[in-house]
Amino acid sequence: MAEMFKVESPHVRYLKDVIEADYSYDTTQVYEEKGVTKVKPCSTKFTFHTERKVPKLGVMLVGWGGNNGTTVTAAVLANRLGLSWMTKTGKKVANYYGSLFQSSTVCLGRGSSGEVFVPFRDLLPMVNPNDLVFDGWDISSLNLADAMFRAEVLDWQLQEQLRPYMEKMKPRPSIYIPEFIAANQEDRADHTIHGTKAEQVQKIREDIQDFKRTSGVDKVIVLWTANTERFCDIIPGVNDTADNLLKAIENGLEVSPSTMFAVASILEGCAFINGSPQNTFVPGAIELAIRHNVFIGGDDFKSGQTKIKSVLMDFLVSAGLKPVSIVSYNHLGNNDGKNLSAPQQFRSKEISKSNVVDDMVQSNPILYGPNEKPDHCVVIKYVPYVGDSKRAMDEYTSEIMMGGANTIVLHNTCEDSLLASPIFLDLVLLTELCQRITFRTETDQEFQTFHSVLSILSFLCKAPLVPAGTPVVNAFFRQRNCIENILRACLGLSPQNHMMLEHKMQRSFVSLKRPSVDCNAYPISSKKGNGVNGFHPPGISNGLSHSNGLGKTVISSDIEIEN
């Protein structure tokens, strides 16, 4: 895939195989010294390498025959084929609305006519979702065309066009251990792998190998979109270390199907993403991923109600309002809702949906004291009639000035699988991109990859999995900015800080006239005609930093900034 633009900078080099970028990572260290809070700006020099060649990517879905699996497969096929269909409201055309990379934009910089926006996907060379190759497993034997019909998600005219393609697709048998999911799933389980746990893991590994061999893909990413499981206890000697987990599988001890799939994927060198709320990544699974330098990510796709919660809570707390009560009610009628009607499976979902507000509460000690947080209640009910059209109702009550109260009530109708499917694509595309990014600091001898626990995926997950000791961030825009700014760093570009100082001065320090360099040499395909790259004269960056020459600046009597 050719780059849609090029960065003209002595700090960025477009080599044959990689984009090499020098980047200054600026942070702020805060510490206490003799009763004074000191603030010290810090800068670390990085060099990023991003491989330019985009691989042929295979995606294996656990639960391929479910609502999500059939919908995302159908969506990719429909986009690849350029399908359109009629509904009662008119003609519809296949698209990827809801995908961060395919349907949202980022500000590249400023040009002669203002800010220049490009599709998120064009920042770095990325896999085109139309080129994805799908395979997977399911405990149900239906081919994907019949499973798509059972799901009742897509319009009938579209299903008719897709049937000739999808009826040829049939999931591989999957692992079924009844005690981990609701008993009401038994009637689907006619397509299972038999044998010991060790034999089942070996069969999954053989399936991955077979898919690689027969499809000709360069990489495989495995994604769990099957039923929500109950939580597993962390048991010393069973799943607390990588070696104990492997022994537990050999000895047939308690290991969940999702963890078994994760182990098989890791041993095959394939990234594994958990799209459900259960604790798939027990300590032993995380250690195994780190040992094999394989990416893992999760947990639980963030699509509807929880995504809104991560935005609204961020808004309320950032505005200085104090949310004191959050009540979230859902009812849905798809198989996910059916499985979640069992108490143990619901508990897994309740935990992932409840923790989404924690970091925003902890960010404001003015509003919340130690151990104080809003009352937070989550309810999910199964109502078969509504199918995949999930209803979500939320009530947010906040304390406002002088003892007042503010209540916000939302009603949200979520087409569950149509919201989740674009997130699948973003997860696998971002994971694959991260596999092609390496970096080092000025003191490192060798380049390194991201940590095996791929926390950059947090934007797409309800309960972000992060490396030990890492802060968990749920706030929507902080998560999105993290992805955008890391990708900008790979191009040697400063983070977007939205200061726009050049427009806030009587005498601007930067000329907004067209630069002498022909910026139109790099047209942006998403716009009519030629676009321009954002222009910054030499020596000027988005982040403006200078010293007053005194060595330190005193902000107040007890806070100092050291330059």
Swiss-Prot record:
Location in the cell: Cytoplasm
Top class in the EC scheme: isomerase
Gene giving rise to this polypeptide: isyna1-b
Cellular component aspect of the GO annotation: cytoplasm
Keyword Lipid biosynthesis (UniProt): yes
Protein name: Inositol-3-phosphate synthase 1-B
InterPro entries reported for this sequence: Myo-inos-1-P_Synthase, Myo-inos-1-P_Synthase_GAPDH, NAD(P)-bd_dom_sf
Species for this entry: Xenopus laevis
GO biological process: inositol biosynthetic process; phospholipid biosynthetic process
Homology family: Belongs to the myo-inositol 1-phosphate synthase family.
Biological role stated in the UniProt entry: Key enzyme in myo-inositol biosynthesis pathway that catalyzes the conversion of glucose 6-phosphate to 1-myo-inositol 1-phosphate in a NAD-dependent manner. Rate-limiting enzyme in the synthesis of all inositol-containing compounds.
GO MF annotations in UniProt: inositol-3-phosphate synthase activity
Pfam family, one: NAD_binding_5
Catalyzed chemical reaction(s): D-glucose 6-phosphate = 1D-myo-inositol 3-phosphate
EC numbers for this chain: 5.5.1.4
